[in-house]
């Protein structure tokens, strides 16, 4: 729970700094109840996003399926297998607080699971 609050704090900071609607949407999703938390499989990422994309997942990334694209993913949490598969494909798996610090001003972010 504490980790989620720290992440929410960083995402709010990114929204205040950039005023980009994607960060406001992510804040609203993270503030909702745990029962409504999102989960996305790596196979869905592989199907929906182009190679080299920057993806925001306001929930957990799960390891079902395969991923062949090099993507940078920022998520609330990752399963061990999802993190391994993303890194094996040449991508990066970052927790949402670090992702928000590093890529808050980046254009072309894709929201999956929102």
PLM features: what roles do these ranges have?
Residues 1-114:
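Extended polybasic, low-complexity segments that bind anionic RNA or targeting/receptor surfaces
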């Amino acid at each position: 729970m504490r980790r989620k609050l720290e992440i929410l704090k960083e995402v709010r900071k990114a929204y205040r700094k950039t005023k980009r609607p994607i960060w406001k949407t992510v804040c609203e999703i993270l503030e909702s109840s745990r029962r409504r938390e999102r989960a996305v499989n790596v196979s869905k990422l592989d199907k929906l996003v182009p190679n080299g994309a920057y993806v925001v997942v306001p929930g957990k990334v799960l390891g079902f399926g395969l991923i062949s694209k090099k993507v940078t993913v920022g998520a609330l949490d990752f399963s061990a297998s999802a993190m391994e598969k993303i890194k094996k494909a040449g991508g990066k798996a970052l927790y949402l607080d670090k992702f928000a610090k590093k890529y808050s001003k980046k254009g072309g972010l894709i929201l999956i699971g929102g």
